[in-house]
C-alpha cells in the first residue's frame, strides 16, 4: 500500500512542477496536504520530497511547493503555547488555585533573565555585512568549466566560441560576420588593481555562505537537550572543514593580492560547491531529515534545513526556503518548541538546569555588564520634545544592553526605554537619540568574562520560585508537572522565535536580489522574508518585538538602499500584524518611515509609504504638529515625482488613507478655524525646509487649494495604478469635506472655489478618456461630489467650460479631440535647486560607501529638478482608438455627467447649457443629437428626482422652441431624411452616400453604353444625385430580374453581363450596408430624443411618435447602455399613461411580454427540441442565466447566427423594460398594470388546492406546447426583478410550473426547469422548499420517466445556478440523486451524476449549517439519510454490514470490509467491480451479499416479487461456484441451478427456473440464450472474471449488457488487462453513460495516456497523461474495491518470481535468422513499436494496417521460442529440411531428431527445475536416504501442442517416474472441476499440465507450490491470474514461479510490454481502493467531476507545435532564437503573492 501511495504522491509532486496552470499546481498542493493527514507517520519523507521543489528555478513551482508545505502544516496538529496555558489555567481552577497563570509560571522572571542573554545583544550589523556573503543571484549560470588546454590559441578560440554563444551571436552567423566583434586581445587577461573606492568583488567572490552561518550561529541559541546526532556531528565536521579552507584562502589573499582570476574562480567555485554540499547534505537521503521525537514539534528538523537554505547563494533556493518558513510560522508559530512530553515531578527536571545549559551553549560575547535597571520590562515610549529635532536627528533607538561601540552608562538607562503614552499623545522626551558616528569592525572581547556574571542571575533562587501548590494531593502534582511543562515550552518557543528572527534580519540585510520587471522593483526574497518575519511577530513576546525593531532601525541607517528597503519591509509587516501595539511603537516607526519617505531611492520611498498605510488611523490620532509634518511631507513628495517614479501610487494611497479617516475631518476643521485667527508658521510646526525657504498659510494640509493641484498630473498617468490612486485620493478629500459640511462644522464651501473649475475639468477629462472601469466609476462619484459645491461657483464654471465640454463629448468616432479645449495642468513649481544639489551629494556619498550614517543624509536628498512645459504637449487623442472602452459608453457617461451638472444650475444661468445644446440638437450629425439628448435626459431626470411630489420634471425657463424641435425630429420617420423640411441624411453617412451614388452612376453608365437595357431604363429612371438606399436596392434588384430574362438572348455579349453583374453586386453591398447603418443610427437618435421628451413630461396628443422609437430601441438597439435608457423612458411613459384614456399600456405590456420569448437560446422551441438527445447535444442544460451580465454591445452576424443575436437583443431589451417597470411601480405593479398579471397567467393557474385536477387537465389539454413555454418564459423574465411584496403572488404559480416539469414534451420540461432555477435565485427559501417537496419525489417515481427526466434536469440547473447557496439543501438532495445514478434512462443518469458530483463538496459545509427554513420536520430530518451522510463525510464511522444469514465460515477482516462495500452499493442501488487479488475470496463475498439480500427479501412482507439472481462465469467455473455456495451458504436460503450443457439440456432445465433463486451459467450460454434470459428481471447479476466483456464490440459483451438486473456486480482480479478502454466496457455494463460514450472516454483518457507513454512526448503531453490518469482514478474509485494479498494476508507465504533466460538452440537460431530476412519483418517491427492494435486503444490504427500474415508471423516467432516443432509441424519442407540436416551431423530423420530435448532449451530448463524439486529423479539418493521437501508443480503453456511435446518428449522419454494430470481446452467444461479436485486431493500427483487460458480462470490449486511458465501471454494479467491459482488463500508454502524466456527474442519485448500494462492498471486501481475508509468517500466530487475536467485538460494536441515547426523551419534561424527566449513575466504573480490584506487574512485564519 505504501508503494501505491507513493505512486500517487509522485504524480502530485510532478504536478507541482509541470501543472499547466497555477490552479492545477495549488490543487496538487492541497492534495499533498491531505496525504500528510492520512499518513502522519510519513511526514518526514513527505517534507523531504517537497523540499526538492522548493529549490526549483521556476517561480510557480516554488510557490506551489510552499503552498504544499502550508497544506501539510495545516493537517498536522500540535498543541500551541496558548492552548497549553489555557489547559493549565483550567487545571489551576480545578485545583482551587486562584493565582494568575503568568504568576504561577513566573513569566516575568523568565523574560527578564532570558533577555539578559538575548542574542540581539550580540547582533552586530557591521559584522554581518563584513563576514556575510551578499546574496543576489547564485551566479552558477555564469560558471565556466576550467579549460585545461595547454595551447593558448585553442583556449582563446574556445573562449571566443563560448562567448559568442552566450551573447547570442551564434544565431546571427548566417546574417552577418561576427568574427570581428570579439578579438583575441579582448580575451587576454589584463592585471588591474582592486578598486580603491569600494568593496569590489570581495564580498561576492571570497566569502563563503557559511561565514554568515557561523557568525549567526554564535548569536543564536542552539539548545540541545540531547547528545548531537550523527547527522549533526557530520554537519559540524563539514563546517570545520569549510572554515579551515576559508582561513587558508584568507592567508593566501594576504600573501598575493593579485592572484589570477582563474585561481580566484576555482577557489570560489570550490568553496561554493563545498557550501552547497554542506547546506544540501541534509536532504541527500530519506532519513536525513530526522523525524522529531514523540511529543516534540514535528517540524523542528525540517525548519533547521530551511534555515540553512536561507543563506544559499542562489536566490531561488533562498526564496523557496523563506516561503516555506512563512507557511510554517503562520500556522505553527505558536506551537514551535512546545513539547507534550510529560514532566513528572520526580524526573529531575529543573528549570534552572535548563537555563544554565542554555547559557553555557550560547557562546555569546557580551561586551558590557547588564545592570538591573536594564532588565525592567520595556514598555515606555520616547517623548518627542522638539518634533523638528527628533525627526531630523532621527536615530536608532538603542534598546537596553546592546553594545554597538557606544558607551552606555547605567544612569542613561532611563532614557533608553520604550515610550509611554501621555494624554493620548506620543511622548518621546525620555528617549536618548544620539547619532552613531562610526561602526568600525573591531569588537572588544575583554569583557567576555561577564558571561559568568550573567550566569549567576540564573542561579538566583528567587528566579526558580516554585508556585505555592500543596504537593500532597495527586492532582496538585499533576498541576505542578503542567507548570513545568508550560515553563519549558515557553522558553523553547521564545528561543525559537528569536532564532528565526535573527536569521530573517540577516537575510533582509544581505539579500541584494531585485526584479525590475515592473514599474516598481520587487525583491521577492526580502518580501517573502518580511512576510515570514510578520508571521513571527504574531506570536512574539512584546519584549522581542522591541529588540527586533531596534535592529530594523539600525538597518535603516545603512547606506545600501537594499538594506533600507528590507528594514522598511519588516516594519510594514510589524505595523500590519501588531496593531494592538501600534500606539507604543509609533514613536520609533514614524521617524524611520519619514526618513524612508525622503530617501534618495524611489523604491525605498514606496515601501515607506506602504508601511504607514496600516497605521493611518494611528497617525491621525496624533494630531498637532506631528500629523501636520507627515501630511505636508507627503504633499511635498508629489512635487518631486516624475513619470518614472514608482512610489507615486504608494504616496497617494497613503494620503488617501489618512484623509479618509473619520478623525481627520475634525482635525481639518479645528486647524482651519485656528488658521483664520492667527498666522501659522509651518516651520514652527516641525517641518524644516531647505535654507531660505518658507511657506505661506495656503500650504497648510487643511487648506487644499494649494495642495490638491499636485494631484492633477497623475490623473492621466501612463500607469493604471497611479491614475486610480490619484482619483481615489481626490475622492477621499472630497468625502472628508462633505462629511464636514453635513455635520455642520463648516458653513463655507468644502472645496476651494479657486480650484473648482480646474478640478471639474480634470474629472471630466477622466470621464472622457478613461477606459478602466474602476477608475471611471470613481470619477463619476467624484463628479457628483463636486457638483454639491455652491451654485455660484458652479455657474462660473459653466459659463467658461460647458460649451467646450459638450463639444468634446460629441466628437465623432475616429476624429481627434480638440486639445485646445482640454486642460493640461502645468506642474506646480518644484523645490529649489538646493535639493537637487543635496541629492547629487547623497548619491556621491553612497557610491563611495561613506561611513557617515544617519537619516539626515537620506533626507537631504531629493529628486533632480525636471521642469516640464505642459503647454508644449501635442498629444493627439483619437476617439475610439482605445478599443477597451466603448465609444457609446463614453458619450453616455460624459453627457450624463453634464446633465447632472446642469440640474444644479439656476434658471438665470440655464442659458450656458441651453445654447450649446440647441446647436447640437439642430445639427445634422446623429452623434451630436445623441449627446444633446442624453444631456437633456440626465438633466430632467435629476430635476424630477429632486422634486418627485408633483411628478413633473419640467423647467420653467426651458425654451419652448427647443421642445418643439424635439417633437419635429420624432416626426421624421424616414431614416434617409431625419430632419424636418431638409432632404439630407445624417452627416456621418455622407461619405457612404457619395460612394453609393458613384457606384450607381457607374452602373447606370455601363447599362446605358451597352444598350441592352434601354427598355428597362425607359420605365425605371434613376436620379443619381438624390437617390436613397432603398431606391438603389430596388433598381439593382429590377436589373437582376431583367438580366435573367435576357440571358437567353445569345446575341448579348457575355462580358457585358459580367460587368453589369459585378457592378450591380458591389452597389447592392454598399446600399445594403448603408441602409443597415442608417437604420441603426436613426433608431438610436430617435429613441434618445423620445426619451428626452418623456423625461420633460410634456407629451403631445398622439403618443405614437414617442412609443415607436422607444419600442424600436427595445427590439433592435445593439448597445445595452442605450437600450437601458430607452427601457427606463418607456417605464416612465407607461407610468404617465396609467390614468390616460385611451391608454396604450395593455398593448405595450403584451408586446413586451411577447418580446421576452424571442430568444431561441433561452426560450425552448417545441418544434426543434423534441427529445432528450437534442437537449444533451445542444447543451441546453448549462445554466445560461437570462439575468446575468449581458454583453454591452452585440454585433450582428448573418444567417442563423443573426437570428439568434437579434433574439438576444430583443429579449435583453424587454427584460430591461420589465426591470424598470418593477422599479417604477414597486408593490403596485399588478394593480396599476393588470395586463401584466394576465400575461403571467395566460395558461398557468395560481394555486387553488381544490382545483388540482383541473390544473392537470388544463396543462395537458393545451395542444400547442409553445404557448405553455412562452407563458413560463414570461414568468422567468419577471421573477428576478419582482418587488418583495409581490413575490408571494408569483409563488402561487409554482405548483403549476412543477406540473410542467413532468410534462410529456421535453421542451416544456426544459422551460419549466429553467424558470424554477431563475426563481430560486431571488426566492431561494420558498422555491427550494417547493423543490424538495415536489421535485425530489419525482426522482423516485419509477412509473413516470418524464417526471424523472424533468426532476433531474431541474436539479442539474439548480446546482449550476445557485452554487454555494445550495449548501443547506445539499444533504436533502444527495441521497435521492445517488439512488438515481443507475436509472434505466441514460439522460436521467447523466443529469443526476453531474448534479451529485457538484453537490458532494458542499456536504462538509452543510454540517455546520442549521437545517433550511420552510421545510417540514419529516423532510429536514431523515435519520437514515443523515447517518449515511455522516459516513460519507467521515468514513471512520462506517458500520459493519450485518448479514441477514449465518455463514459456514469465519470472515476475515478484509472480507467483512468487502461486504460493507457491497452493502453500500446495494443500499443505494449502485454497481461496482470487486477486483481483489485472485484467491482472496471474491466468490465468498459475492455469495454472502446475495444470500443476505435473499434472506432480507424473504423476511420482508412488503416484497411481493422475489427476483432470482444470475451468476455468469467461464464454463470451467460453473461447478466451482455451485461448490463454493454449497460450502459456505445455507442451502435452504440459496437454491442453485447450473444452467449449462447442450441446447436440448438447457431447454429442459428451464422448467426448473422457478424452483431456484440462483442461476449459474456461462458466458457462451448467455450469448446463445440471450433472448430467453432477458425475459427475466434479475435481482443480482454477477459477472465472474468480468474482464471477459472487455471488448465492447464482442457478441458476448452485447448479450451480457442486455440482462436486466437491480444490482450489477463484476468480479475480476484484473479489470484492466491491455488498455484503459477495457475499463469503459466494464462500466458500460455497470452504469451506462457514467464514463461517457466510448468516443468521449477515448478522447478524455485513452489518447492522453497513449501520448504520455511516448518517451519523446512533450511536457504538456506528459502532464496531460498524469492528469488523465489521476482523473480516471478518482472517477472510478468508489466503484472499485481492490485489495492485494500482500496488504491483507500477513500469513500468506511470499511469491518468488524468477526469470530463467535461455539461449536459442542452433536449430531455433537458424529458423529465426531465416525469418529476419523475410518481408514480414518490417511490418512486425512497426507493430511492436505501436504496441499492437490491442494496446493502442485506437481501433482505427493497427488493424487496418496489419495484414493477416503479419499476425501469423508474430505467432511463428513466439512458437519458435518454445520449440522448433511448433512451427515446422510433422512435415518439414525440403529447403528447410536440407538446411537443418546440414547443421545436424548424421541426421537422417529430421522430425525424429527435433523431438530430442536439446533442440528446445526450454525443455532442458524445465527438466532441471523438476529435478531441483525432486520430481522425476530416482526415488532415493546415492546414499540411500529418501528425498525430502517434495514439491508439486503446475506447468503452463499457451498451446496444447507444447503440452503434447512435454508429455511425449520429456515425461515419457526422460522422466517416466513423473505422475501428472492435464487440463486444457479439450477437456469438456463439466469435467474440468473434477480434475482440479482430483489433483488437490491426491498428493501423489507431481505435475498438472495446463494451458494458460483454461487454467487461469478462478481455479483453486493451492496444493501446488511451484509454477513453470513455458510461454507468455501478450496480456500480463492472464499470466498473473495463472500464478494466483496457487498463490491464494489456503496456500501454506512459499510459491516459486519460474518464467522461461528466450534471450534476445520477441519474448523479451513481450515481457517489457507487460510491465507498462501492469503500471497503467496499478495507477488507475491502486491501494486507495482498498476499503471504504481509504476511498475518500468525502471527496466524491472528484470521482464524478473529473470526467469533465479531464476532457478539458486531458486531450492535449500537438498541432500547435507541429505548425510552429513548419513555419519556423529547422536549423539556426528565427525558431532557434525564439526558442531560447523565456516567457514574459506576469506581474500578477508578484501582486497575488505579496498582497498584504491576503497575508493578514491567512495569518489570522
UniProtKB/Swiss-Prot annotation:
SUPFAM superfamilies: ARM repeat (SSF48371), P-loop containing nucleoside triphosphate hydrolases (SSF52540). One of its GO terms (biological process) is positive regulation of shoot apical meristem development. A motif (DEAH box) lies at residues 1584-1587. GO terms for cellular component: nucleus. The keyword Transit peptide does not apply. Its main location: nucleus. Its EC number is 3.6.4.-. The keyword Membrane does not apply. Keywords: ATP-binding, DNA-binding, Helicase, Hydrolase, Nucleotide-binding, Nucleus, Repeat. HEAT repeats lie at residues 3-40, 41-78, 584-621, 702-739, 1288-1325, 1367-1405. Residues 1463-1633 form the Helicase ATP-binding domain. ATP binds at residues 1476-1483. Residues 1805-1976 form the Helicase C-terminal domain. It is found in: Nucleus. Belongs to the helicase family. Involved in meristem development. Acts as a positive regulator of the CUC-STM pathway in shoot apical meristem (SAM) neo-formation. This is TATA-binding protein-associated factor BTAF1. The gene is BTAF1.
Amino acid at each position: 500500500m505504501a508503494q501505491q501511495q507513493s505512486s500517487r504522491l509522485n504524480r502530485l509532486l510532478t504536478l507541482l512542477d509541470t501543472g499547466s496552470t497555477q490552479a492545477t499546481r495549488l490543487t496538487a498542493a492541497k492534495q499533498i496536504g491531505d496525504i500528510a493527514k492520512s499518513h502522519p507517520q510519513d511526514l518526514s519523507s513527505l517534507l523531504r520530497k517537497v523540499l526538492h521543489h522548493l529549490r526549483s528555478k521556476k517561480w510557480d513551482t516554488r510557490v506551489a511547493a510552499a503552498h504544499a508545505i502550508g497544506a501539510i502544516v495545516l493537517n498536522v496538529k500540535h498543541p500551541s503555547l496558548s492552548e497549553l496555558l489555557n489547559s493549565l489555567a483550567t487545571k489551576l481552577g480545578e485545583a482551587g488555585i486562584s493565582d494568575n497563570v503568568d504568576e504561577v509560571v513566573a513569566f516575568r522572571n523568565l523574560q527578564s533573565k532570558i533577555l539578559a542573554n538575548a542574542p540581539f545583544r550580540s547582533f552586530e550589523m557591521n559584522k554581518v555585512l563584513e563576514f556575510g556573503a551578499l546574496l543576489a543571484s547564485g551566479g552558477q549560470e555564469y560558471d565556466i568549466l576550467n579549460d585545461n588546454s595547454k595551447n593558448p590559441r585553442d583556449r582563446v578560440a574556445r573562449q571566443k566560441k563560448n562567448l559568442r554563444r552566450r551573447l547570442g551571436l551564434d544565431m546571427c552567423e548566417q546574417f552577418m560576420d561576427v568574427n570581428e566583434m570579439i578579438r583575441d586581445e579582448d580575451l587576454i587577461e589584463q592585471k588591474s588593481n582592486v578598486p580603491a573606492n569600494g568593496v569590489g568583488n570581495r564580498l561576492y567572490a571570497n566569502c563563503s555562505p557559511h561565514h554568515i552561518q557561523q557568525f549567526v550561529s554564535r548569536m543564536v541559541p542552539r539548545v540541545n537537550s540531547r547528545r548531537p546526532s550523527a547527522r549533526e556531528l557530520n554537519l559540524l565536521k563539514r563546517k570545520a572543514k569549510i572554515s579551515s579552507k576559508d582561513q587558508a584562502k584568507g592567508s593566501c589573499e594576504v600573501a598575493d593580492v593579485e592572484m589570477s582570476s582563474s585561481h580566484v574562480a576555482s577557489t570560489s567555485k570550490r568553496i561554493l560547491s563545498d557550501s552547497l554540499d554542506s547546506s544540501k547534505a541534509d536532504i541527500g537521503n530519506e532519513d536525513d531529515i530526522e523525524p522529531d521525537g514523540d511529543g516534540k514539534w514535528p517540524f523542528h528538523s525540517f525548519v533547521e534545513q530551511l534555515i540553512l537554505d536561507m543563506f544559499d547563494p542562489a536566490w531561488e533556493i533562498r526564496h523557496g526556503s523563506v516561503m516555506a518558513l512563512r507557511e510554517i510560522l503562520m500556522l505553527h508559530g505558536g506551537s514551535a518548541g512546545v513539547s507534550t512530553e510529560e514532566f513528572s515531578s520526580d524526573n529531575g527536571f529543573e528549570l534552572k538546569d535548563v537555563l544554565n545549559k542554555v547559557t553555557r551553549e550560547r557562546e555569546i560575547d557580551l561586551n558590557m555588564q547588564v545592570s538591573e535597571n536594564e532588565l525592567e520590562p520595556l514598555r515606555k515610549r520616547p517623548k518627542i520634545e522638539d518634533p523638528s529635532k527628533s525627526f531630523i536627528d532621527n536615530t536608532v533607538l538603542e534598546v537596553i544592553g546592546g553594545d554597538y561601540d557606544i558607551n552606555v552608562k547605567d544612569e542613561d538607562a532611563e532614557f533608553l526605554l520604550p515610550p509611554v503614552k501621555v494624554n493620548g499623545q506620543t511622548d518621546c522626551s525620555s528617549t536618548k537619540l544620539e547619532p552613531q558616528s562610526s561602526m568600525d569592525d573591531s569588537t572588544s572581547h575583554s569583557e567576555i568574562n561577564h558571561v559568568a556574571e550573567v550566569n549567576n542571575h540564573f542561579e538566583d533562587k528567587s528566579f526558580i520560585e516554585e508556585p505555592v501548590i500543596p504537593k500532597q494531593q495527586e492532582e496538585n502534582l499533576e498541576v505542578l508537572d503542567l507548570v513545568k511543562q508550560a515553563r519549558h515550552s515557553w522558553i523553547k518557543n521564545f528561543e525559537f522565535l528569536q532564532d528565526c528572527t535573527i536569521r530573517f534580519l540577516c537575510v533582509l540585510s544581505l539579500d541584494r536580489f531585485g526584479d525590475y520587471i515592473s514599474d516598481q522593483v520587487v525583491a521577492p526574497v526580502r518580501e517573502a522574508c518580511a512576510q515570514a518575519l510578520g508571521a513571527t511577530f504574531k506570536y512574539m513576546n512584546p519584549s522581542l518585538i522591541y529588540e527586533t525593531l531596534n535592529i530594523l532601525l539600525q538597518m535603516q541607517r545603512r547606506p545600501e538602499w537594499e538594506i533600507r528597503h528590507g528594514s522598511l519591509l519588516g516594519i510594514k509587516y510589524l505595523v500590519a500584524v501588531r496593531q494592538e501595539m501600534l500606539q507604543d511603537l509609533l514613536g520609533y516607526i514614524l521617524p524611520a518611515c519619514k526618513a524612508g519617505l525622503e530617501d534618495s531611492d524611489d523604491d525605498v520611498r514606496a515601501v515607506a509609504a506602504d508601511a504607514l498605510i496600516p497605521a493611518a488611523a494611528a497617525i491621525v490620532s496624533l494630531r498637532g504638529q506631528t500629523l501636520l509634518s507627515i501630511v505636508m511631507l507627503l504633499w511635498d513628495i508629489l512635487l518631486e515625482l516624475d513619470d518614472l517614479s514608482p512610489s507615486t501610487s504608494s504616496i497617494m494611497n497613503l494620503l488617501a488613507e489618512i484623509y479618509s479617516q473619520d478623525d481627520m475631518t475634525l482635525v481639518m476643521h479645528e486647524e482651519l478655524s485656528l488658521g483664520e485667527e492667527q498666522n501659522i508658521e509651518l516651520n514652527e510646526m516641525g517641518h524644516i525646509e531647505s535654507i531660505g525657504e518658507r511657506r505661506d498659510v495656503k500650504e497648510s494640509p487643511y487648506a487644499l487649494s494649494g495642495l490638491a493641484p499636485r494631484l492633477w498630473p497623475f490623473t492621466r498617468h501612463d500607469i493604471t495604478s497611479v491614475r486610480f490612486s490619484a482619483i481615489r485620493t481626490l475622492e477621499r478629500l472630497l468625502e472628508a469635506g462633505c462629511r464636514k459640511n453635513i455635520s455642520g462644522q463648516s458653513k463655507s464651501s468644502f472645496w476651494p472655489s479657486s480650484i473648482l473649475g480646474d478640478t471639474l475639468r480634470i474629472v471630466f477629462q477622466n470621464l472622457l478618456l478613461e477606459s478602466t472601469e474602476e477608475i471611471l466609476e470613481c470619477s463619476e462619484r467624484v463628479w457628483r461630489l463636486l457638483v454639491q459645491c455652491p451654485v455660484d461657483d458652479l455657474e462660473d464654471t459653466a459659463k467658461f467650460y460647458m460649451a467646450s465640454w459638450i463639444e468634446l463629448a460629441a466628437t465623432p468616432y475616429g476624429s481627434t479631440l480638440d486639445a485646445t479645449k482640454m486642460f493640461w495642468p502645468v506642474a506646480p513649481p518644484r523645490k529649489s535647486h538646493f535639493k537637487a544639489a543635496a541629492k547629487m551629494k547623497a548619491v556621491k556619498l553612497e557610491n563611495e560607501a561613506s561611513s557617515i550614517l544617519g537619516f539626515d543624509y537620506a533626507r537631504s536628498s531629493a529628486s533632480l529638478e525636471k521642469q516640464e512645459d505642459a503647454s508644449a504637449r501635442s498629444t493627439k487623442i483619437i476617439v475610439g482608438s482605445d478599443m477597451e472602452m466603448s465609444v457609446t459608453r463614453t458619450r453616455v457617461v460624459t453627457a450624463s455627467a453634464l446633465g447632472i451638472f446642469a440640474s444644479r444650475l439656476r434658471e438665470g444661468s440655464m442659458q450656458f447649457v441651453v445654447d450649446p445644446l440647441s446647436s447640437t440638437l439642430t445639427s445634422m450629425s446623429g452623434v451630436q443629437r445623441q449627446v444633446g439628448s442624453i444631456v437633456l435626459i440626465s438633466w430632467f431626470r435629476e430635476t424630477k428626482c429632486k422634486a418627485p411630489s408633483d411628478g413633473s420634471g419640467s423647467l420653467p425657463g426651458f425654451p419652448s422652441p427647443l421642445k418643439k424641435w424635439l417633437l419635429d425630429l420624432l416626426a421624421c420617420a424616414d431614416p434617409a431624411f431625419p430632419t424636418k423640411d431638409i432632404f439630407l441624411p445624417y452627416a456621418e453617412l455622407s461619405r457612404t452616400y457619395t460612394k453609393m451614388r458613384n457606384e450607381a452612376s457607374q452602373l447606370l453608365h455601363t447599362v446605358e453604353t451597352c444598350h441592352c437595357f434601354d427598355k428597362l431604363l425607359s420605365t425605371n429612371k434613376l436620379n443619381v444625385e438624390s437617390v436613397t438606399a432603398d431606391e438603389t436596392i430596388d433598381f439593382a434588384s429590377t436589373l437582376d430580374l431583367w438580366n435573367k430574362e435576357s440571358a437567353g438572348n445569345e446575341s448579348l455579349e457575355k462580358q457585358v453581363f459580367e460587368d453589369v453583374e459585378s457592378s450591380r453586386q458591389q452597389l447592392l453591398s454598399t446600399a445594403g450596408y448603408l441602409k443597415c447603418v442608417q437604420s441603426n443610427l436613426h433608431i438610436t437618435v430617435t429613441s434618445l430624443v423620445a426619451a428626452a421628451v418623456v423625461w420633460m413630461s410634456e407629451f403631445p396628443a398622439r403618443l405614437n411618435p414617442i412609443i415607436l422609437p422607444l419600442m424600436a430601441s427595445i427590439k433592435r438597439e445593439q448597445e445595452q447602455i442605450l437600450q437601458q435608457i430607452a427601457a427606463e423612458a418607456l417605464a416612465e411613459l407607461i407610468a404617465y399613461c396609467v390614468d390616460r384614456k385611451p391608454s396604450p399600456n395593455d398593448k405595450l405590456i403584451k408586446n413586451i411580454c411577447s418580446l421576452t420569448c424571442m430568444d431561441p437560446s433561452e426560450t425552448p422551441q417545441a418544434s426543434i427540441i423534441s427529445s432528450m438527445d437534442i437537449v444533451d447535444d445542444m447543451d441546453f442544460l448549462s445554466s445560461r442565466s437570462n439575468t446575468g451580465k449581458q454583453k454591452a454591445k452585440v454585433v450582428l452576424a448573418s444567417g442563423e447566427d443573426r437570428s439568434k443575436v437579434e433574439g438576444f437583443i430583443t429579449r435583453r431589451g424587454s427584460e430591461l423594460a420589465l426591470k424598470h417597470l418593477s422599479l417604477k411601480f414597486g408593490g403596485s405593479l399588478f394593480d396599476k398594470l393588470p395586463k401584466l398579471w394576465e400575461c403571467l397567467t395566460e395558461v398557468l393557474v395560481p394555486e387553488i388546492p381544490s382545483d388540482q385536477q383541473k390544473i392537470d387537465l388544463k396543462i395537458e389539454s393545451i395542444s400547442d406546447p409553445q404557448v405553455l413555454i412562452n407563458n413560463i418564459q414570461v414568468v422567468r423574465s419577471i421573477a428576478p426583478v419582482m418587488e418583495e411584496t409581490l413575490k408571494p403572488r408569483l409563488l402561487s404559480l409554482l405548483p403549476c410550473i412543477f406540473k410542467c416539469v413532468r410534462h410529456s414534451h421535453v421542451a416544456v420540461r426544459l422551460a419549466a426547469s429553467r424558470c424554477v432555477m431563475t426563481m430560486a435565485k431571488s426566492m431561494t427559501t420558498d422555491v427550494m422548499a417547493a423543490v424538495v417537496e415536489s421535485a425530489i419525489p419525482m426522482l423516485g417515481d419509477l412509473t413516470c420517466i418524464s417526471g424523472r427526466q424533468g426532476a433531474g434536469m431541474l436539479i442539474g440547473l439548480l446546482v449550476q445556478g445557485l452554487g454555494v447557496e445550495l449548501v443547506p439543501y445539499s444533504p436533502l438532495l444527495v441521497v435521492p440523486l445517488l439512488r438515481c445514478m443507475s436509472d434505466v434512462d441514460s439522460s436521467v443518469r447523466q443529469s443526476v451524476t453531474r448534479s451529485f458530483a457538484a453537490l458532494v463538496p458542499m456536504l462538509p459545509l452543510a454540517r455546520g449549517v442549521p437545517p433550511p427554513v420552510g421545510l417540514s420536520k419529516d423532510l429536514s430530518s431523515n435519520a437514515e439519510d443523515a447517518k449515511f451522510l455522516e459516513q460519507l463525510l467521515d468514513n471512520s464511522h462506517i458500520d459493519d454490514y450485518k448479514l441477514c444469514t449465518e455463514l459456514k465460515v469465519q470472515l476475515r477482516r478484509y472480507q467483512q470490509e468487502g461486504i460493507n462495500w457491497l452493502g453500500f452499493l446495494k443500499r443505494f442501488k449502485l454497481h461496482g467491480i470487486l477486483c481483489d487479488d485472485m484467491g482472496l475470496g471474491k466468490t465468498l463475498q459475492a455469495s454472502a451479499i446475495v444470500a443476505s439480500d435473499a434472506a432480507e427479501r424473504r423476511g420482508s412482507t412488503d416484497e411481493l416479487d422475489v427476483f432470482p439472481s444470475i451468476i455468469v462465469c467461464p464454463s470451467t467455473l460453473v461447478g466451482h461456484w455451485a461448490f463454493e455456495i454449497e460450502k459456505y451458504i445455507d442451502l435452504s436460503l440459496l437454491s442453485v441451478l447450473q444452467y449449462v450443457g447442450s441446447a436440448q439440456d438447457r431447454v429442459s432445465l428451464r422448467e426448473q427456473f422457478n424452483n431456484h433463486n440462483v442461476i449459474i451459467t456461462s458466458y457462451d450460454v448467455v450469448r446463445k440464450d440471450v433472448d430467453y434470459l432477458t425475459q427475466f428481471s434479475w435481482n443480482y447479476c454477477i459477472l465472474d472474471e468480468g474482464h471477459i466483456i472487455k471488448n465492447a464490440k464482442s457478441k458476448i459483451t452485447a448479450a451480457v449488457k442486455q440482462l436486466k438486473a437491480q444490482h450489477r456486480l463484476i468480479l475480476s482480479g484484473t479489470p484492466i488487462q491491455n488498455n484503459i478502454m477495457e475499463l469503459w466496457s466494464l462500466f458500460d455494463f455497470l452504469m451506462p453513460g457514467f464514463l461517457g460514450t466510448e468516443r468521449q472516454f477515448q478522447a478524455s483518457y485513452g489518447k492522453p495516456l497513449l501520448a504520455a507513454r511516448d518517451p519523446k512526448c512533450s511536457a504538456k503531453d506528459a502532464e496531460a497523461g498524469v492528469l488523465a490518469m489521476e482523473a480516471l482514478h478518482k472517477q472510478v474509485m468508489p466503484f472499485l474495491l481492490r485489495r492485494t494479498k500482500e496488504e491483507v494476508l500477513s500469513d500468506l507465504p511470499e511469491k518468488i518470481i524468477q526469470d530463467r533466460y535461455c539461449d536459442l538452440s542452433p536449430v531455433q537460431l537458424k529458423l529465426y535468422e531465416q525469418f529476419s530476412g523475410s518481408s514480414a519483418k518490417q511490418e512486425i517491427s512497426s507493430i511492436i513499436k505501436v504496441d499492437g492494435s490491442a494496446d493502442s486503444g485506437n481501433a482505427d490504427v493497427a488493424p487496418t494496417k496489419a495484414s493477416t500474415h503479419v499476425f501469423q508471423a508474430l505467432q511463428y516467432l513466439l512458437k519458435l521460442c518454445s520449440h522448433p516443432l511448433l512451427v515446422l509441424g510433422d512435415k518439414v519442407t525440403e529447403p528447410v529440411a536440407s538446411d537443418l540436416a546440414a547443421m545436424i551431423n548424421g541426421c537422417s530423420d529430421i522430425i525424429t531428431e527435433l523431438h530430442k530435448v536439446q533442440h528446445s532449451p526450454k525443455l532442458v530448463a524445465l527438466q532441471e527445475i523438476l529435478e531441483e524439486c525432486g520430481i522425476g529423479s530416482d526415488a532415493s539418493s546415492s546414499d540411500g536416504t529418501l528425498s525430502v521437501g517434495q514439491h508439486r508443480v503446475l506447468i503452463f503453456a499457451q498451446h496444447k501442442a507444447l503440452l503434447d511435446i512435454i508429455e511425449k518428449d520429456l515425461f515419457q522419454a526422460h522422466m517416466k517416474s513423473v505422475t501428472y494430470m492435464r487440463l486444457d481446452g479439450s477437456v469438456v467444461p463439466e469435467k474440468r472441476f473434477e480434475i482440479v479436485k482430483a489433483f488437490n486431493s491426491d498428493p501423489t500427483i507431481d505435475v498438472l499440465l495446463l494451458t494458460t487460458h483454461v487454467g487461469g480462470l478462478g481455479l483453486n490449486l493451492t496444493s501446488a507450490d511451484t509454477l513453470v511458465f513455458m510461454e507468455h501471454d501478450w496480456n500480463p494479467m492472464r499470466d498473473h491470474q495463472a500464478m494466483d491459482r496457487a498463490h491464494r488463500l489456503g496456500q501454506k508454502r512459499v510459491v516459486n514461479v519460474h518464467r522461461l524466456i528466450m534471450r534476445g527474442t520477441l519474448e523479451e519485448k513481450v515481457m517489457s510490454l507487460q510491465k507498462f500494462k501492469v503500471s497503467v492498471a496499478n495507477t488507475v486501481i491502486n491501494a486507495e481502493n482498498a476499503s471504504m475508509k481509504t476511498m475518500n468517500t468525502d471527496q466524491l466530487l472528484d470521482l464524478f467531476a473529473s470526467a469533465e475536467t479531464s476532457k478539458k485538460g486531458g486531450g492535449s494536441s500537438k498541432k500547435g507545435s507541429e505548425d510552429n515547426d513548419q513555419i519556423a523551419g529547422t536549423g539556426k534561424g528565427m525558431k532557434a532564437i525564439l526558442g531560447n527566449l523565456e516567457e514574459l513575466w506576469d506581474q500578477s504573480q508578484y501582486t497575488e503573492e505579496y498582497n498584504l490584506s491576503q497575508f493578514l487574512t491567512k495569518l489570522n485564519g
